[in-house]
UniProtKB/Swiss-Prot annotation:
Protein name, entry field: Photosystem I P700 chlorophyll a apoprotein A1
Keywords assigned: 4Fe-4S, Chlorophyll, Chloroplast, Chromophore, Electron transport, Iron, Iron-sulfur, Magnesium, Membrane, Metal-binding, Oxidoreductase, Photosynthesis, Photosystem I, Plastid, Thylakoid, Transmembrane, Transmembrane helix, Transport
Binding site for [4Fe-4S] cluster: C573, C582
GO biological process: one example: photosynthesis
Gene name linked to the record: psaA
Length: 750
């Protein structure tokens, strides 16, 4: 750490009134580009307009102007998020059975949408219990509202109005910080200040205020709810905040105020800042007092972290110094130059952030079921399945986005003349070794993982079960995974002496938790079936990485096309006369990577859905006998490809296929429609541009004959446009098909 004398001069961080506010440009589509602004000659114009509208790099080369546009757009994005949240809360306030659900969450399903009977579609309003008819929702909003201490639909209504006010504030901020007081480039590049404010402000004070809300509002209200008090009789949130005696009745140590804090007698607060571990047996969720404790601890860590970086007072860490000192014995210049890259290329910055956020989102997906954070979430199987699936898809898309922006950085922002022997340069210089090894790994994993299934299918077909890989014949137990499970299950009292239970019941060792006769969570057994499918996961993930990483490492040049950087991020081929150079652009790698990301995530969510129905979710009788939804058939059925097709896809599709005439029939229609959207994509992916151009010419001829030809000349989609439309419909169709299949199934049986 270097300590320099503080600099007294005042820095001016904004420009006043840099851009006049005017609506004239709104009337000129494509005002950001000279070519597009001329208006359409051919139908390609509308595609270029959409492709380039948000590509700020192509509007100007001025980094300050680009930064301001991105910054302003972020406020617009936040405004949309607040608007969306407001809509969710408004539905809860106006169209939901939230108050009824609150009084009996085990027998009443959450619903916040009632279909109007216009053409007879009121059939979709199923009976969710308690005499309420509506569409069952699986977003988890009811559970999070209960955890926050919301007890009435009026409170939801007020929150919805509050979110609308914030949405308009964000819109105003977006306009203000572009037209009235726009930050200078130096402000965007002041990473130490940004770190301090984001760490201490957003994460530190954000967590602290949430911890405060949980202690003063959520905990007491949930205490009353758990005890069966009618929500209408529970004091309102502000009463707990203003009247300490109310809290002291529930938590006696509240009467002592801040004295235990200053006398370091902190254990007095253990009533509401607990360290219990495990799940609350009443709600099947994590203990809310544990969650409050967690947020308080996190807040303190981030508040400290937000004071570590050097800004005005010449004390603290400088990011540039940290990065440049980061050298290993075998890494040449190490991270030298990374600081310059990350403060001048927003694509490089975004790429890192997307990779981190995508990975975090996938980690969240796995924690939502193994450590269910909200009351009555674990027994709402539809919501559990939806939350896992949703976070897996989002994580997958974010990680592909990370590769996309890394490649854009390589093409547009990377300057090879200034980079020598730093980590990035060294990776680029041995990219052939990286990609060829990765390729070998993919071939190995593909043949071996798939080979195990093919072996099992063959033995099963020949009637030789004793020669199959299974828990009852040739065992391939996942011993490393079981070892990790055992370490965690045995941690309390050994490696974590302060803990009373392990972090998650899924590790094993504990008793199952059931709420209202339904299983919330139990130790998850792993066997040969999991070993097989985990190697399919390894295979699909490595292929996705191979495609995406090859796109990044060969974005600027390759043996095939040494001057690739000059062709840009997306191009169809290296010009006429160079055969075999199509589909090599960085964009095409993102395109291909999306398909393999879709493969990867599909296998994960199928594995999760079947495993949970087979080994976790189910009912428990008065005698303590657990009956799982599919009766534990995962271990013996999922070890063949035929088993996946027969006992998972086909057997569990019966609910969506037979949904017509019931309240689930919308899922049946979606299942059909989404298959159609998916099939529609193949038309774009399997045919060439010339085919369509020929067809268009004869259609134009017919229009000319009838004198109804348009002034704008119709053109076939370019190769890139066709692939973009194709992959979009492929993913949209595939994801919506899966959604309909999952939800119809789990709402019917869960």
């Amino acid at each position: 750490m270097i300590i320099r004398p503080s600099e007294p001069e005042v820095k001016i961080a904004v420009d006043r009134d840099p851009v006049k506010t005017s609506f004239e440009e709104w009337a000129r589509p494509g005002h950001f580009s000279r070519t597009i602004a001329k208006g359409p000659d051919t139908t390609t114009w509308i595609w270029n307009l959409h492709a380039d509208a948000h590509d700020f790099d192509s509007h100007t080369g001025d980094l300050e102007e680009i930064s301001r546009k991105v910054f302003s757009a972020h406020f617009g994005q936040l405004s949309i998020i607040f608007l969306w949240l407001s809509g969710m809360y408004f539905h809860g306030a106006r169209f939901s059975n939230y108050e009824a659900w609150l009084s009996d969450p085990t027998h009443i399903g959450p619903s916040a949408q009632v279909v109007w009977p216009i053409v007879g579609q009121e059939i979709l309003n199923g009976d969710v219990g308690g005499g309420f008819r509506g569409i069952q929702i699986t977003s988890g909003f009811f559970q999070i509202w209960r955890a926050s201490g919301i007890t009435s639909e009026l409170q939801l209504y007020c929150t919805a109005i509050g979110a609308l006010i914030f949405a308009s504030l964000m819109l105003f901020a977006g306009w203000f910080h572009y037209h009235k007081a726009a930050p200078k480039l130096a402000w965007f590049q002041d990473v130490e200040s940004m770190l301090n404010h984001h760490l201490a402000g957003l994460l530190g004070l954000g967590s602290l205020s949430w911890a405060g809300h949980q202690i003063h509002v959520s905990l007491p209200i949930n205490q009353f709810l758990d005890a069966g008090v009618d929500p209408k009789e529970i004091p309102l949130p502000h009463e707990f905040i203003l009247n300490r005696d109310l809290l002291a009745q529930l938590y006696p140590s509240f009467a002592e105020g801040a004295t235990p804090f200053f006398t370091l007698n902190w254990s007095k607060y253990a009533e509401f800042l607990s360290f219990r571990g495990g799940l609350d047996p009443i709600t099947g969720g994590l203990w809310l007092s544990d969650i409050a404790h967690h947020h308080l601890a996190i807040a303190i860590l981030f508040l400290i972290a937000g004071h570590m970086y050097r800004t005005n007072w010449g004390i603290g860490h400088g990011l540039k110094d940290i990065l440049e000192a980061h050298k290993g014995p075998f890494t040449g210049q190490g991270h030298k130059g990374l600081y310059e890259i990350l403060t001048t290329s927003w694509h490089a910055q975004l790429s890192l952030n997307l990779a981190m956020l995508g990975s975090t989102t996938i980690v969240v997906a796995h924690h939502m079921y193994s450590m269910p954070p909200y009351p009555y979430l674990a027994t709402d199987y539809g919501t559990q399945l939806s939350l896992f699936t949703h976070h897996m898809w989002i994580g997958g898309f974010l990680i592909v986005g990370a590769a996309a922006h890394a490649a854009i950085f390589m093409v547009r922002d990377y300057d090879p003349t200034t980079r020598y022997n730093d980590l990035l340069d060294r990776v680029l210089r041995h990219r052939d070794a990286i990609i060829s090894h990765l390729n070998w790994v993919c071939i190995f994993l593909g043949f071996h993982s798939f080979g195990l299934y093919i072996h099992n299918d063959t033995m099963s077909a020949l009637g030789r079960p004793q020669d199959m890989f299974s828990d009852t014949a040739i065992q391939l137990q996942p011993i490393f995974a079981q070892w990790i499970q055992n370490i965690h299950a045995g941690a309390p009292g050994v490696t974590a002496p302060g803990a009373t239970t392990s972090t998650s019941l899924t590790w094993g060792g504990g008793e199952l938790v059931a709420v209202g006769g339904k299983v919330a969570l139990l130790p998850i057994p792993l066997g040969t079936a999991d070993f097989l499918v985990h190697h399919i996961h390894a295979f699909t993930i490595h292929v996705t990485v191979l495609i995406l990483l090859k796109g990044v490492l060969f974005a600027r040049s390759s043996r095939l096309i040494p001057d690739k950087a000059n062709l840009g991020f997306r191009f169809p081929c290296d010009g006429p006369g160079r055969g075999g150079t199509c589909q090599v652009s960085a964009w095409d790698h993102v395109f291909l990577g999306l398909f393999w990301m879709y493969n990867s995530i599909s296998v994960v969510i199928f594995h999760f859905s079947w495993k949970m129905q087979s080994d976790v979710w189910g009912t428990i009788s008065d005698q303590g006998i657990v009956t799982h939804i599919t009766g534990g058939n995962f271990a013996q059925s999922s070890i063949t490809i035929n088993g996946w097709l027969r006992d998972f896809l086909w057997a569990q599709a019966s609910q969506v296929i037979q949904s017509y005439g019931s309240s689930l029939s919308a899922y049946g229609l979606f299942f059909l429609g989404a298959h159609f959207v998916w099939a529609f994509s193949l038309m774009f992916l399997f045919s060439g541009r010339g085919y369509w151009q020929e067809l268009i010419e004869s259609i134009v001829w017919a229009h000319n004959k009838l004198k109804v030809a348009p002034a704008t000349q119709p053109r076939a989609l370019s190769i890139i446009q066709g692939r973009a439309v194709g992959v979009t419909h492929y993913l949209l169709g595939g994801i919506a098909t899966t959604w309909a299949f999952f939800l119809a199934r789990i709402i019917a049986v869960g």
